[in-house]
Swiss-Prot record:
Keywords: DNA damage, DNA recombination, DNA repair, DNA replication, DNA-binding. GO terms for molecular function: single-stranded DNA binding. PANTHER family: SINGLE-STRANDED DNA-BINDING PROTEIN (PTHR10302:SF27). The gene is ssb. A motif (Important for interaction with partner proteins) lies at residues 159-164. This is Single-stranded DNA-binding protein. It comes from Streptococcus mutans serotype c (strain ATCC 700610 / UA159). Gene3D superfamilies: Nucleic acid-binding proteins. GO terms for cellular component: nucleoid. Coiled coil: none annotated. Residues 1-104 form the SSB domain. GO terms for biological process: DNA recombination; DNA repair; DNA replication.
Amino acid sequence: MINNVVLVGRMTRDAELRYTPSNQAVATFTLAVNRNFKNQNGEREADFINIVIWRQQAENLANWAKKGTLLGITGRIQTRNYENQQGQRVYVTEVVADNFQILESRATREGQSNSYNAGGNNNFGGNNFSSQGSSQSQTPNFARDESPFGDSNPMDISDDDLPF
């Protein structure tokens, strides 16, 4: 059987970091994942997926990723159940993350936070990353105006040189 999940989305809130009685770190958060299609009104909808992550990964996530952070998650789907105060059985399905990766630079995250706050939209505000002298001007420019092979000479390859 295969139970493997790969998700890319944005955190809808800061992760809630807690510790079990045996001192195991566990963090929970919700990831907003856009659907690949548009609805009848031409708008993209999103699924809000509950994520649980354990141990050192949980502590790292709580320290580095904040509301609005674009994350890549790998893990598995798990369903658990419990009995609520009314005596009813409640089923909860969530993704147990094995790994996560932040998919944008700190400068991008800070820029989003600033632009959303300036525009009056606080959807992704609250990133507590310190800039400490970093600025957008220090971001390398990866655009190329010329061919990286422009100064090289063409190779002479005959049919006899090819192994097939």
